[in-house]
């Protein structure tokens, strides 16, 4: 649909048969030495995870960088992200394409997701957020300290 958009695929130990998908607008990069460069040089983070437990680290990293996401339900698990408010959830191929294009073209939506994701990760997954949560837990059982 959009030959002006290039999909970059990252991942360590990428199998050779996956690399065969590379074409004009798909780049099979594989392992990325510096993730900072990856998150700063792309407009949308895509995580088509179909299985896995727990919070996905790369999803949280993209949130911390304020990089809007298109995810599966599995990739969004445990992050607090909500479809249409802080991310786009996609399952079918057409939903992925539409979601990526929407975030490329709609600057207001891109900004909204970037801000909402950044706020979410700071309040729920930062050191300060964790410290505040533990302080509240300790206070609730009478172990409050002023330090």
Label the model's feature ranges.
Residues 2-37:
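Nucleotide-activated donor-binding/catalytic signature segment of Leloir-type glycosyltransferases, i.e.
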Residues 16-18, 35-36, 53-55, 75-80:
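Short glycine/proline-enriched, acidic/aromatic patches that form the donor-sugar handling elements
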Residues 40-54, 65-68:
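Acidic donor-binding loop of glycosyltransferase active sites
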Residues 55, 72-73, 90-91:
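Conserved acidic donor-binding loop of glycosyltransferase catalytic domains
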Residues 58-62, 68-72:
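Short hydrophobic beta-strand element within catalytic cores of glycosyltransferases
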Residues 83-94, 102-107:
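Conserved acidic donor-binding segment of nucleotide-sugar-dependent glycosyltransferases
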Residues 105-140:
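A charged, aromatic-enriched C-terminal amphipathic alpha-helix characteristic of glycosyltransferases
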């Amino acid at each position: 649909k959009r030959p002006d958009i290039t999909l970059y695929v990252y991942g360590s130990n990428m199998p050779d048969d996956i690399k065969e998908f590379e074409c004009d607008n798909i780049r099979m990069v594989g392992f990325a030495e510096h993730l900072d460069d990856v998150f700063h040089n792309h407009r949308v983070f895509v995580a088509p995870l179909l299985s896995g437990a727990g919070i996905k680290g790369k999803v949280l990293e993209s949130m911390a960088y304020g990089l809007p996401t298109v995810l599966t339900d599995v990739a969004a698990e445990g992050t607090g992200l909500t479809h249409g408010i802080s991310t786009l959830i996609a399952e079918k191929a057409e939903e992925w394409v539409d979601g990526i294009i929407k975030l490329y073209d709609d600057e207001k939506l891109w900004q909204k997701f970037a801000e909402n994701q950044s706020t979410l990760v700071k309040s729920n997954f930062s050191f300060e957020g964790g410290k505040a949560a533990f302080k509240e837990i300790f206070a609730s059982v009478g172990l409050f300290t002023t330090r």
